[in-house]
């Protein structure tokens, strides 16, 4: 499985237009695209959002690169700068709830980005410290992680903000106990 994560910075006052664009243009444009397994979009603030797409393979994503670029060019009218894009093979993840394509269910996304000092150490931290927190949590839908070179990106989607916030506190405590500076070059950034 291969992921592409796009993090746009939205212009002030453009959030509602961007939401409509994603619902009416992006989701319909990519519906039934061969090799595209899932697509998720979230607004993480008044001027920030996340689009995450899962593909069968890197080649499946590359086969629609022109379509992706066309839609990004159209979305530029909502952005204050070019989006940050991360891509990579899945290195961790689990589906806790199966949600059908046409099923409407709220989800609260938490995505964390950090520049890893050692990718293996960060992956071990996720498996040994983060996964047990996930396993004991209520309301978790899906988790995952990729590396784009030495940048680690992990995410989780929750049924409610309360469930996400409760887990986020435990996850931050785990990171603090491990010493974030031993794992990452600088602080991690969380989008929620």
Indicate where each model-derived feature is located.
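Short S/T/G/P-rich N-terminal loop/turn motif that feeds into the first structured element of a domain
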Residues: 1-50, 56-192
